[in-house]
Amino acid sequence: MEPNELKRALGAGLLSFPVTPFDDKGEFNPDVYGAHIDWLSGYDATVLFAAGGTGEMFSLSPDEIPNIVATAKAASNGVPIVGGCGGGTRVAVEIAKGIEKAGGDGILLLPQYLIDAPQAGLYAHVKAVCDAVGFGVTVYNRDNCVLQTETIQRLADDCPNLIGFKDGTGELGLVRRITATLGDRLTYIGGMPTAELFAEAYLGAGFSTYSSAVFNFVPQLACDFYKALRAGDRATCENILNRFFFPFMDLRSRQKGYAVAAIKAGVRLQGFAAGSVRPPLTDLTSQEVDILAGLIEPWKQ
């Protein structure tokens, strides 16, 4: 897929990050993954992200990621697949090349591990990855990789295949300056945990879409919220927030890492054998799974 084609797809509707299922030995389970991707592709997400943050990219080895992307691509029924990419620069370059070779439509470049870096170093890191591939690159602005306006402008000027900017900082002043400065050069994606909680604010800051984690297990609910948001139907948005998203936020906030573990539990509750999360994350307790089951019961499929 050409970078600008991916850019248009990213901005055309709701996005999501499927979980990565593991078997009893903790290995990638392609059969369950393919079935889950096939199910999700029947809803209205315009791009799916394989091995992204919700897909536990941080717990995957670099050589696992291309196979996960290829499996998603084969099962997605034409929905574009973007692969998660990260680590130090050399590792990220190799992962990006592997995703491109596996048939992925682009990458999401997650922050480098552990180390903080100055803007000049972040520029060099992102540019090296962009230069290594021909497809579209979306940079994830959060944690150790918070790009300032001047840096993202420079990258947009120097990297034609940089087509997306995803924000997970919640710094609306910064991101509004970026959207005002770069205009339609990039597609802007909301990337806060449980992004629906922040979607109205990000829409006002120039972000047309976001990645929905709960789309993994209540896809119709996620689509209904997105449609209400884009239609300016605040009453429907608030109804869904009160009935589902605020209680889900309370559950998700019980432990660090539950932003991923709770999603995987929801996928299991919908009948997909997604397995456990890999360390250092931990699964929900049985009591917490029961709470989640009650929460999703009205939208059980």
Swiss-Prot record:
The keyword Glycosyltransferase does not apply. The keyword Ubl conjugation does not apply. InterPro entries: Aldolase_TIM (IPR013785), DapA-like (IPR002220), Dehydro-deoxyglucarate_dehyd (IPR017655). Gene3D superfamilies: Aldolase class I. Keywords: Lyase. One of its GO terms (molecular function) is 5-dehydro-4-deoxyglucarate dehydratase activity. Its EC number is 4.2.1.41. It is an enzyme of class 4 (lyase). It catalyses: 5-dehydro-4-deoxy-D-glucarate + H(+) = 2,5-dioxopentanoate + CO2 + H2O. Pathway: Carbohydrate acid metabolism; D-glucarate degradation; 2,5-dioxopentanoate from D-glucarate: step 2/2. Belongs to the DapA family. This is Probable 5-dehydro-4-deoxyglucarate dehydratase. It comes from Allorhizobium ampelinum (strain ATCC BAA-846 / DSM 112012 / S4).
